[in-house]
Regions:
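Short, structured beta-strand/loop micro-motifs enriched in basic residues and often containing a Trp
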Residues: 29-39, 79-85, 180-188
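N-terminal, Lys/Arg-enriched amphipathic/low-complexity engagement segments
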Residues: 7-77
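Short, well-ordered loop/turn sites that connect or cap secondary structure elements
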Residues: 48, 91-94, 197
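Intrinsically disordered, low-complexity linker/loop segments enriched in Gly/Pro
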Residues: 106-199, 204
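A generic structural signal for residues embedded in beta-strands
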Residues: 56, 99-102
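Short, conserved secondary-structure segments in the cores of folded domains
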Residues: 44, 87-90, 193
Length: 204
């Protein structure tokens, strides 16, 4: 059955938004290798048209290596190989200088018993002094907190349930020349960690 948008005046004039959207799935198997840098040197794993929907299976920033509260990041992670990213996703017709709009429809926790992770990591993050951001206070001890989570809430404890308000930490266009660490925010986007970049939002 033909979608009404395909026969619209806007579609006949070639406007990208006037095409019936297709839905693509980018599973872990289809993604294959996840990336720790963002740049023009990785081959596309998916090609879509403007207006298409993409369902993406992502990994957490620790790539699933922090499974329990005993898995200290300093022991199980190999920096800077963290914050793995999906993609690249090629948008047909997109050219240098274009403005892209990404609408985030929904975010659903993965797995039978999804758990979030909070952690204090030595030499990493806003609460820990680094060579670039020295603090007068002593470093906080390294600690991991695993938290049950579903679409109804974030279960900090038996008495405390926090609202479920997910957001995408890293979203990016490819820089023209550079290959940039996925932990870095910059003009291309990257690791922005914006709480506003969640379901119902549009990122330009």
């Amino acid at each position: 059955m033909t979608h009404w948008l395909d026969k619209s005046l806007a579609a006949m004039r070639g406007l990208g938004w006037a095409k019936s959207p297709r839905t693509h799935e980018l599973t872990e198997a289809k993604q294959g290798v996840y990336h720790y840098t963002i740049g023009p040197y990785s081959s596309e794993v998916l090609r879509i048209a403007p207006g298409d929907r993409v369902i993406v299976e992502t990994r957490d920033a620790f790539e699933g290596k922090v499974k329990t509260e005993e898995d200290l990041p300093s022991k199980v992670l190999r920096m800077p190989f963290v914050n793995p990213q999906n993609g690249p996703i090629m948008i047909e017709g997109a050219e240098k200088g274009d403005v892209l709009a990404v609408y985030i429809e929904s975010m659903i926790p993965r797995g039978e018993n999804p758990r979030g992770t909070c952690a204090m990591i030595p030499q990493f993050g806003a609460l820990s002094g680094t060579s670039l951001t020295a603090l007068l206070a002593e470093d906080l001890p390294e600690i991991v907190r695993k938290i049950d989570v579903d679409e109804q809430g974030v279960y900090w404890s038996k008495r405390v349930t926090l609202p479920y308000k997910p957001h995408i930490g890293t979203l990016s266009c490819s820089p023209e020349i550079d290959s940039i660490n996925t932990l870095t925010p910059d003009q291309h986007g990257g690791n922005m960690d914006l709480p506003d970049m969640g379901p119902g939002s549009i990122t330009y």
